[in-house]
Amino acid sequence: MNSNANNTPIAIGISQVFPCSYLDGQQEQLLVIQEETLDPILFERLLAIGFRRSGSAIYKPRCPRCSACQPIRVPIQEFVPSKRQKRTLAHNRDLTWRITTEHTETQYALYEKYIRERHFDGPMYPPSKAQYEQFLFCHWLPPTFIEVYDDNRLVAVAVTDTLPNSFSAIYSYFDPDEERRSLGVLLILLQCRLAKLQGKAFLYLGYQIDANRKMSYKRLYRPYQILTHQGWEYSQVC
């Protein structure tokens, strides 16, 4: 693959096959960018062809017998919140939010609580600071944190990459004791709002996996586009 207008090649490797963490009985295999450092423009080009970031690693599924992972993005300037999403915004009017690139112990403490109480049966359990930093941080692209507060108490965090023409949602976590607030929904809506204010074209949400119920929420932000063999296409599948 060529990395820029000068046709400088970049190396792409392929991982071993290992059990899929999203679909029982399936096997996973990844294409992995082998470069130690990328620039935001190149990374955004890779997002547009289906790659994702985890830590400093850039990868794309290339599974032997499965194509369930569908890259999904929201065209921000066309996005309109649904009635339910508008109710979520109204219900959380009492909360405040701020944008920072600072990493704090309070953020990690909330992440640890979230994983212990909401994902104790998943691959991210048990949480650790080393795992947290390896998963979210990238030495060539510092992430942006959208923090949500109830008075002075941190209740939710969205971790996102800010790129020239888009946002890329990396991960969101929140206080499990505040489940009635639908903070996961709120965090995506805040990313949409911020992206629109900054004139971005897209919010990349990662991979939509229809067969995994926990991943189905990504289709709720409309309109959205799915990356197919023909390119990015609008979809109305619920």
Curated annotation (Swiss-Prot):
GO aspect biological process, one term: proteasomal protein catabolic process
The EC code for this enzyme is 2.3.2.29
Q: Name one GO cellular component term.
A: cytoplasm
One example of the protein's molecular function in GO is: arginyl-tRNA--protein transferase activity
Please tell me the species this chain comes from.
Shewanella oneidensis (strain ATCC 700550 / JCM 31522 / CIP 106686 / LMG 19005 / NCIMB 14063 / MR-1)
Q: Mind telling me what this protein is named? A: Aspartate/glutamate leucyltransferase
Q: Which family does it belong to?
A: Belongs to the R-transferase family. Bpt subfamily.
Query: Localized where?
Result: Cytoplasm
- Keywords of this protein's UniProt record, alphabetized? Acyltransferase, Cytoplasm, Transferase
Extract the SUPFAM superfamilies matched here. Acyl-CoA N-acyltransferases (Nat) (SSF55729)
Enzyme class label: transferase
Superkingdom field = Bacteria
Q: Which reactions does this protein catalyse? A: N-terminal L-glutamyl-[protein] + L-leucyl-tRNA(Leu) = N-terminal L-leucyl-L-glutamyl-[protein] + tRNA(Leu) + H(+); N-terminal L-aspartyl-[protein] + L-leucyl-tRNA(Leu) = N-terminal L-leucyl-L-aspartyl-[protein] + tRNA(Leu) + H(+)
Q: What does this protein do?
A: Functions in the N-end rule pathway of protein degradation where it conjugates Leu from its aminoacyl-tRNA to the N-termini of proteins containing an N-terminal aspartate or glutamate.
The protein's matches in InterPro entries, at most eight in alphabetical order, are given as: Acyl_CoA_acyltransferase, Asp_Glu_LeuTrfase, N-end_Aminoacyl_Trfase, N-end_Aminoacyl_Trfase_C, N-end_Aminoacyl_Trfase_N
Primary location: cytoplasm
